[in-house]
């Protein structure tokens, strides 16, 4: 595939619109993983609010990006940091597998 110099969104959830987005470029992922990502993102936004997006950086690193609407006083910033740390700890295997998948199938890296 062509090399992409921009960050690539894997998926995200929006508490304001109560919507989940999954990038169709990743439809090759097993359905169980897609469902696990949806549950993870939606539960995060139900817990702390805001918008959570899982984004691949240029080097294939998978990052959590959090944004909020201006003057969202209900957003739990401390809870957000704690929840992301918890997800990084409890979903380590999933997140590492997703990074490897992206590096091999999208960046063309060797194993």
Predicted stretch roles:
Residues 100-103, 107-110:
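Charged/polar positions within long, soluble alpha-helices
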Residues 16, 20-22, 26, 64, ...:
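Phenylalanine-focused residue identity feature
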Residues 1-47:
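Negatively charged, low-complexity tracts enriched in Asp/Glu with abundant Ser/Thr
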Residues 1-3, 93, 109-111:
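Non-catalytic accessory regions used for complex assembly or targeting
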Residues 29-33, 41, 84, 95, ...:
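Short, structured coil/loop segments at alpha-helix boundaries
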Residues 46-102:
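Amphipathic protein-protein interaction modules
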């Amino acid at each position: 595939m062509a090399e992409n110099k921009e960050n690539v969104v894997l998926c995200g959830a929006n508490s304001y619109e109560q919507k989940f987005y999954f990038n169709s470029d990743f439809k090759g992922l097993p359905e169980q993983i897609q469902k696990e990502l949806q549950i993870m993102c939606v539960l995060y936004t139900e817990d702390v609010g805001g918008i959570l997006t899982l984004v691949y950086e240029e080097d294939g690193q998978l990052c959590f990006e959090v944004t909020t609407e201006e003057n969202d006083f209900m957003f739990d910033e401390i809870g957000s940091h704690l929840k992301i740390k918890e997800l990084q700890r409890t979903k380590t295997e999933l997140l590492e597998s997703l990074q490897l998948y992206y590096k091999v199938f999208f960046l063309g890296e060797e194993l």
